């Protein structure tokens, strides 16, 4: 939700939406802290090695989710900066940012799985999107350098644009990490016979 909101703030900055995003981030951080506390206690108890590894995987997944939230906040803060300085991106730059945002939202949508059977194909699905994000990030960086060279944008806006692209690219990386974590957790649970082999 925060990833979507961060892009919406770039289109039109609204203080109430920005505050809601910040509150969401505080809740994400709260959940992450509680997950860390719970998993640390669970790992310290007498667990079979596979169980400890599975708990460790969920701990890493939680950390990746928290990092996605951080990148969404980064984008929102950049939107606030543009608003406060009355600066705007070109239509072309906004279209490119919109494409990066959509690709990231696609990854996050893929990660909303309802049962363990879906874990088996999640890495392949997310990997395709994440690879597309990397290629798109590269192409849009080239486009931006061209705009800068042709004096179609300011240096200040170019720096902010590049940081936003990087935030979206990192969101894709963390999304792939989560997909891989889900798959490994499923395999570990199968090994422990916590779920049926498919």
Please place each PLM-identified region on the residue numbering.
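Cytosolic, long alpha-helical scaffolding segments
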Residues: 1-198
């Amino acid at each position: 939700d925060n990833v979507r909101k961060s892009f919406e703030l770039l289109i039109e900055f609204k203080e109430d939406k920005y505050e809601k995003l910040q509150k969401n981030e505080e809740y994400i951080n709260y959940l992450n802290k509680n997950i860390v506390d719970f998993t640390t206690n669970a790992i310290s108890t007498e667990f079979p090695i596979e169980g400890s590894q599975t708990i460790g995987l969920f701990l890493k997944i939680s950390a990746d989710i928290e990092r996605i939230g951080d990148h969404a906040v980064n984008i929102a803060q950049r939107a606030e900066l543009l608003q406060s300085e009355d600066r705007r991106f070109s239509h072309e730059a906004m279209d490119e940012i919109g494409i990066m945002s959509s690709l990231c939202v696609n990854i996050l949508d893929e990660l909303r799985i309802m049962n363990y059977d879906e874990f088996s194909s999640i890495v392949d699905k997310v990997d395709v999107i994440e690879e597309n994000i990397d290629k798109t990030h590269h192409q849009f960086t080239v486009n931006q350098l061209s705009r800068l060279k042709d004096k179609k944008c300011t240096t200040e806006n170019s720096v902010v644009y590049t940081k936003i692209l990087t935030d979206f690219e990192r969101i894709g990386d963390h999304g792939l990490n989560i997909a891989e974590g889900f798959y490994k957790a499923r395999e570990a649970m199968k090994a422990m016979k916590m779920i049926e082999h498919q």
